[in-house]
């Protein structure tokens, strides 16, 4: 449609711009009204209206001047010479190009992703292949056909395609949007054309068959994962809680787990409760936020997560008193921060790149609650016998009815 309009650009009339402007604003208003907020946020909608209005004004002035030249008459804007009208057209074209560049810049900041150099992107290729080969060997020894792998700090949303492992992260315009919505509802990262496992708790990662985690340091072993392989500065950890691709869930649990009106922490605590946990799986612990950073003084050994208020800050850095650091990118997407396992007396600082105050809420993982919920799901599981891109076969011994 845009190309057809461009082909007939010289024949466009003043009234054509008015009609197109009204139609565009109307379409935008209808789209925003029926949007659920995860596709088109308020800030993005406001910016779209501003840019759309700018284009309409620029085109109206441009074609008004054009009609004045064609008709060679003086209209309401006063006596303007033909040469002046030509200058006015050039100015409007310049304004239009400037508005387009600003829109591209804004759109990238809202929906784009950080880039990395080719050198950095493939720097650890051999090490990745080495630990992934070890993961495959270990899985085969255990008779496991299917499992997923993720990185604690990925370079892009498509790292799985580069290194050749199966993940629960995808960047694609053809993805299932409902998966993205689910990820967002339970504190993971999601958007219009991607979903990412960032922010997953042990229960969620277990449900996604996430068996292995790749990290760039040897300090990530803890009660929920163990170090099983390493190559260079690349380390492979195996998660304690992993479910196979197929597992049974009680229909009563599915019906009762309505997370639509719950925040991401409440949604997970509710699921754990329905699966038999006697205590909340995630419990709030003290934290303090000031301009530029937030601090958590860990009182007891625990795996720590954190949520935060909506923010325009794009990146945060975690600094732990034991020497570990971790970077979080695109935090404006609003996912839960996985701060890792910390012992009593450890201090965790979360600094942001904009030197702004970002109020966080920290949570400690209750391992007993997580274990209870996991064991409930692990009671009836499917033993996979083969799989391909289009077919999965397996067997399961169902002792209690439910949904696979």
What are these regions (language model features)?
Residues 1-127:
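Contiguous transmembrane helix-bundle modules in multi-pass membrane proteins
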Residues 91-403:
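Soluble catalytic regions of membrane-associated enzymes that act on cell-envelope
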């Amino acid at each position: 449609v845009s190309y057809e309009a461009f082909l007939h650009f010289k024949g466009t009339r003043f009234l054509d711009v008015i009609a197109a402007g009204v139609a565009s604003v109307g379409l935008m208003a209808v789209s925003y009204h029926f949007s659920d907020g995860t596709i088109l946020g308020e800030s993005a909608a406001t910016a779209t209206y501003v840019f759309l209005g700018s284009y309409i004004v620029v085109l109206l002035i441009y074609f008004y001047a054009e009609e004045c030249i064609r008709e060679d008459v003086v209209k309401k804007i006063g006596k303007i010479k033909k040469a002046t009208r030509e200058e006015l057209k050039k100015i409007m074209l310049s304004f239009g190009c400037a508005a387009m560049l600003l829109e591209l810049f804004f759109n990238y900041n809202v929906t784009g992703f950080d880039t990395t150099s080719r050198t950095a992107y493939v720097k650890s290729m051999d090490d990745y292949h080495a630990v992934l080969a070890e993961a495959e060997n270990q899985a085969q020894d255990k008779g496991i056909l299917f499992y997923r792998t993720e990185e604690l700090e990925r370079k892009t949303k498509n790292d799985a395609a580069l290194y050749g492992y199966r993940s629960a992260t995808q960047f694609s315009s053809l993805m299932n949007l409902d998966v993205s919505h689910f990820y967002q509802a339970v504190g993971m990262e999601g958007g219009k054309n991607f979903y990412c496992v960032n922010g997953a708790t042990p229960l969620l990662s277990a449900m996604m068959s996430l068996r292995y985690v790749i990290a760039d340091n040897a300090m990530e072993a803890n009660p929920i994962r163990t170090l099983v392989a390493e190559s260079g500065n690349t380390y492979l950890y195996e998660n304690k809680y992993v479910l196979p691709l197929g597992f049974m869930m009680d229909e009563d649990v599915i019906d009762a787990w309505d997370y639509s009106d719950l925040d991401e922490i409440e949604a997970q605590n509710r699921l754990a409760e329905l699966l038999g946990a006697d205590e909340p799986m995630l419990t709030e612990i003290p934290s303090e936020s000031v301009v530029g950073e937030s601090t958590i003084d860990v009182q007891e050994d625990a795996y720590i997560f954190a949520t935060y208020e909506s923010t325009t800050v794009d990146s945060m850095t975690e600094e732990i008193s034991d020497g570990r650091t971790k970077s979080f990118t695109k935090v404006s997407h609003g996912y839960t921060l996985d701060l890792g396992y910390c012992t009593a007396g450890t201090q965790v600082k979360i600094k942001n790149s904009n030197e702004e105050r970002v109020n966080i809420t920290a949570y400690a993982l209750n391992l007993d609650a997580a274990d209870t919920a996991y064991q409930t799901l692990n009671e009836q599981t499917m033993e996979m016998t083969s799989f391909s891109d289009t077919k999965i076969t397996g067997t399961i011994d169902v002792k209690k009815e439910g949904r696979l």
